[in-house]
Amino acid sequence: MEVLGLIKKYKYQLFITINLLWIWALLSPNIYYFDDSYRAAGGYYNWGGDFRPFSDWLYYTIGMGRNFTDLTPLPQILALGFLYSIYFLYLKNFTHKKMTLTNLVVFIPIIWSPFLLSNLYFRYDSIFMLLAVLLSVLAIFEVNHKKYIRAILLLFVALGFYQPAIVAYVCTALFIIYKIEQENKKSIFKLWFKKSAIYFSVFLVAILLYYFLVMKFTTDYNFYSATHSQMAIKNFIPNVIQAIKEISIIFHGDTGSIYLAIFFYLVLLNLIFLIQKVSYFGLLIFIVTHLSFIISAVGVNLLLDVPRFEYRTFIFYGFYISYLLLGTSQLLNQANYKKYLYMILFFVTFYFYSIALNVSNAQKSKKDFEDSVMINLVQDLYEIDNCNDCYYVFLGEYNPYIVHRLIDKYPVIMKIVSSSGYYIYKMQNYFPVQLKYRKFVNDIDKYNFFEKNVNLYEILKQDKFYTIYGNGENIIIYFKGDGSYR
């Protein structure tokens, strides 16, 4: 185990080097991610219409006025600072004072979660998304210090920045419950119930305050917020099932199947660990804890009629995997089992790390390809007569073969690098006037619109990568790639 000895000896140097490479991979594509293009080309913020008014205020402050400003890479760097602050808070509060290699690695999934890449690639949104996560984590520790008003204020502000981030509050509460299980064997049920009740009460008060003081009176409803604000209890089970389906993409592919086996092994070890610690009451804790993580996966989509399951809303995932690894590290923290522990830690963290590097390369390849195709598309659109007031509809997506190969290996990459729903924003950069586009509740509605009308439209332009249809009122740009609808 000479190699392991060297890793332990130089663990801090390795930690810094590997994380710097991960950060470089994240920042190096230098892309306009999703609706970054919309904000950059349109010159306005408009997060308030998505129930995030504090985000507008933040950019009015750092941008020194209402006019749009692009401070990249500063927002992403600050977002990374917030993210690593969460990591070190977890190290401080949930490990022993002695810093071991295991402790350093256990909480890495909080940073390297593949789903979190969808938050970090935003050159504008990332700063307040991760700030909201940090505030949600800090709120829990304020509750522990019995500073309830401060905790409510932190959650209130987090909600004003990015509502899905508050699942970090729930996840951190579950870690503290885990700590209680370790340190208290007497009256554990009473203590566990009391803590849970306090955490929930603070959480509920913050949400109610935000709803009645901000959402109900100050939100300027737009198409997105109006569409994604209708709720019903009947949506609970279907939305939970849909969230699990979306997250299960992480287990697809050849490497993903190995990760799936390890994941179930971690869940089993977590159950064994809890039963060892608190007898059969551990089974109840196991069920409640994992159900809580599942509900955190659904997050703000829990009761929505039209949920929006974007990867950026799955903030819980890194916390959940770290929770499983923490219990496993306690159970296998013996000389006879440590080699198995190191194997598990290495595979899980390298799997996440590899996805991040592959996403970075996919983003670069896709950006180069889309830039060249977009120039041709813009030229074709300028040649179309009498369509200054047309509405645009983009359908499908074309991925270069390099990106296809990476997606075959790691299917989770596909939705991270997908940009089909945001081509209209990329297009705006080439037109001096605001383009109009058809709005749809979801992709199914868009595809139905296409199927219903395509035979009534004239083919205006044909290209290897796309077809342009038109009828004088609408322009449909259909991309022909394997990622497309047809």
Label every PLM stretch briefly.
Residues 68-73, 97-103, 145-150, 188, ...:
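Membrane-helix interface segments
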Residues 101-135, 160:
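Aromatic- and kink-enriched transmembrane "portal" helix at the membrane-lumen/periplasm boundary
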Residues 75-88, 110-111, 133-136, 322:
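Transmembrane alpha-helical segments of multi-pass membrane glycosylation machinery
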Residues 136-150, 183:
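Membrane-interface transmembrane helices that cradle and orient dolichyl/undecaprenyl
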Residues 331-355:
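Signature aromatic-anchored transmembrane alpha helix within multi-pass, membrane-resident enzymes
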Residues 116-126, 304-309, 359-362:
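Membrane-interface helix caps and helix-loop-helix hairpins in membrane proteins
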Residues 2-59, 63-83, 92-107, 253, ...:
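Intrinsically disordered, polar/acidic, low-complexity terminal segments
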Residues 22-85, 105, 123, 156, ...:
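Transmembrane catalytic cores of multi-pass membrane glycosyltransferases
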